[in-house]
Amino acid sequence: MLKKSSLASVVTIAGTDPCGGAGIQADIKAISATGAYPASVITVLVAQNTCHVTAIQEIPLCFIQQQIDAVFSDLAIGAVKLGMLYQEEIIHLLVNNLKKYQPPFIVLDPVMITQTGHLLLKPQAINALVNDLFPLAALITPNIPEAETILKSPINDFNSLRDAAITLAKQYKISVLLKGGHLKSVDSPDI
C-alpha cells in the first residue's frame, strides 16, 4: 500500500489502447519513464490497433467514480493527466471530482478524433470539455485537428500553428503545448 506516500504519483484518466501506442497504456509507460508512480482510471474501453478503431465500450459512470475514489483515497497524487473522456457525462463527473480532490497539476489532452477519422469525443461533449475542464487544467496538449475544432479555424503552416497556440493560451488563460505532427511539412514542430 502506498497510502499517501512521498513517492510522486501521477494518475492518468483516459481510454484504453490494446496495442499500447496511445491511451492508458502509453501514459503508464511515459509516467514510469519519468520515475513517477503511475495510477490509472479507465473511462472507456477501445478496441483498436495501429490502423483503426473497431469498437468503443462505455463504462458505467458509477464504476468510473469507484476507480477515482480508490486511487485518490490511497495515493498522494502529484498530477493528473486526462485523455480520452468520450462523453459529456464523464467530463462532468471529472470536473466534480477534480474540484473535490484538488490535485496540484492537471494536464489535459483533449482527445477528439483518431488519425483515421474515428470520433473519440462525442460532438456534444466539446463544449463541456472547453468550458468546464479547460479552466481546471494547468496545461492543454491538443494536436492540430483538435485545435482546429476548438478554434473553428484552419491550421495550415507554422505561422498559423503558432498563432493558434497563442490564441488558445490567451482565450483560455492556460498553458498550451500544440502538437504539430499533422502539419504538412518536413518537420513536425510542437509549440
Predicted regions and their residues:
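Glycine- and other small-residue-rich loops at beta-strand/loop junctions that grip anionic moieties
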Residues: T16, L82-G83, H118, K179
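Conserved N-terminal subdomain of the carbohydrate kinase-like
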Residues: L2-T12, S32-Q115
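Conserved phosphate/ATP/ADP-binding segment of small-molecule kinases
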Residues: P123-I191
